A protein has these predicted regions:
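SH3-family beta-barrel domains
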Residues: 2-35, 46-50, 57-60, 67-101, ...
């Protein structure tokens, strides 16, 4: 698959054929972050937030080197990640979720600090997000995980 045309930041082809950097999310609330790409490397910490968006900054066939909302970098196994997109409010302030793509559009809800919601799409500086039955728009730059590239 490496011949799919995608490359890592240093120009090498990616093992998966997917773009690097790219956004993924954590599948479970127990994801071990390791110092290197393999079970022989020490566990640095454990992520406890299913759906947390992280950015893949390098990869091997089985492992993904990711950067999290705090800027920490570690390796996770491919099986604990998902291609589903999500965003995270990594600020101490609530982020308004609007009915439409406008600051003047009615506020449907507020994304609480340290909260995760599903990401549907981003356009014109706005991202459509979902949480349970709620759907709305947030300013793209206000959330972690919505940027198109590093």
């Amino acid at each position: 698959m490496a011949g799919a045309g995608q490359t890592m930041p240093d120009g090498r082809p990616t093992p998966t054929g997917l773009e690097v950097p790219r956004w993924i999310s954590l599948k479970s609330s127990h994801v071990r972050a390791r110092q290197g790409p393999g079970l022989d490397y020490p566990i640095l910490w454990e992520y406890r937030a299913a759906g947390l968006p992280v950015q893949v900054i390098a990869e091997t066939t089985e492992w993904r080197k990711v950067c999290d909302p705090e800027g920490a970098v570690a390796w996770i196994h491919r099986t604990v990640s998902s291609g589903r997109r999500s965003v995270f409010n990594n600020t101490d302030a609530e982020i308004p979720i609007h009915a439409g793509k406008s600051q003047t559009s009615p506020v449907r809800a507020r994304l609480q600090p340290r909260s995760i919601v599903s990401l549907d799409e981003c356009e014109d500086g706005w991202c459509r997000v979902r949480a349970r039955r709620l759907e709305g728009w947030v300013v793209q730059r206000a959330v972690f995980g919505a940027q198109s590239r590093a």
